[in-house]
């Protein structure tokens, strides 16, 4: 792989420590990426330990296969972590996993490689798919979606307040010629944005929304969290690193729901609530963020938030 696209793993030591790895434990890395967390975790495992990695990205799978060839304790699977439950059941591991790690979002190699089509800074084909062999590309969505749908994606997933204005500009321009390149789309969005945020590219939010939609990131996260909980053994750890407020909100609400049971929806004076609604998770500590040293070494870690929970039942 080109060194230009090197990935710096975020919250590396913190995430591995949060898993509280046992030498003979069984662990899942739901977002293998370039293997930073997996390699660090393998260093903590003994000869009886096992680690199963997941990723949709073909380039990540190549890296994972190389690691599997080096270390027989590791196996890589080309699946979304949303399908974690199916894989775990097929391997007879449901309820037997000691820790699950999810490091969400897009990796540096994906962002920095223009050919992947994620970046508004480097021109490339307008793709944005984590797995280029599955689903529709960003270009296909932009070419076919109604103006209202484009605006919804920008607003709901990108939290872009000028979503309608941007969608209108895109639909008007596509009547002349289709959008095929990231720079072309970024230029139209930038012109349509009347109020640029200081220190942020005017296309940032729209591109985030488009990427999340194309990859069904939030839907996959909800499915993956449910599957992770079922896969864990009692005492197993769930560690999730998110990079924007939409992801973090889903993670926070999921952990709180299972830490407090469903009792939040019932009257506080209901006498049987504590007996009927037993928590399945215990929240461990407060959300963790990158240290000052990590922020200096890797500015992309500035938005990272890590949450940790332990399975109770």
From Swiss-Prot:
<dbReference type="GO" id="GO:0070475">
    <property type="term" value="P:rRNA base methylation"/>
</dbReference>
<keyword id="KW-0808">Transferase</keyword>
<dbReference type="InterPro" id="IPR029063">
    <property type="entry name" value="SAM-dependent_MTases_sf"/>
</dbReference>
<dbReference type="InterPro" id="IPR002903">
    <property type="entry name" value="RsmH"/>
</dbReference>
<protein>
    <recommendedName>
        <fullName>Ribosomal RNA small subunit methyltransferase H</fullName>
        <ecNumber>2.1.1.199</ecNumber>
    </recommendedName>
</protein>
<feature type="binding site">
    <location>
        <position position="110"/>
    </location>
    <ligand>
        <name>S-adenosyl-L-methionine</name>
    </ligand>
</feature>
<dbReference type="GO" id="GO:0005737">
    <property type="term" value="C:cytoplasm"/>
</dbReference>
<dbReference type="GO" id="GO:0071424">
    <property type="term" value="F:rRNA (cytosine-N4-)-methyltransferase activity"/>
</dbReference>
<comment type="function">
    <text>Specifically methylates the N4 position of cytidine in position 1402 (C1402) of 16S rRNA.</text>
</comment>
<keyword id="KW-0698">rRNA processing</keyword>
<comment type="similarity">
    <text>Belongs to the methyltransferase superfamily. RsmH family.</text>
</comment>
<keyword id="KW-0489">Methyltransferase</keyword>
<feature type="binding site">
    <location>
        <begin position="35"/>
        <end position="37"/>
    </location>
    <ligand>
        <name>S-adenosyl-L-methionine</name>
    </ligand>
</feature>
<keyword id="KW-0963">Cytoplasm</keyword>
<keyword id="KW-0949">S-adenosyl-L-methionine</keyword>
<feature type="binding site">
    <location>
        <position position="103"/>
    </location>
    <ligand>
        <name>S-adenosyl-L-methionine</name>
    </ligand>
</feature>
<feature type="binding site">
    <location>
        <position position="81"/>
    </location>
    <ligand>
        <name>S-adenosyl-L-methionine</name>
    </ligand>
</feature>
<feature type="binding site">
    <location>
        <position position="55"/>
    </location>
    <ligand>
        <name>S-adenosyl-L-methionine</name>
    </ligand>
</feature>
<dbReference type="Pfam" id="PF01795">
    <property type="entry name" value="Methyltransf_5"/>
</dbReference>
<dbReference type="InterPro" id="IPR023397">
    <property type="entry name" value="SAM-dep_MeTrfase_MraW_recog"/>
</dbReference>
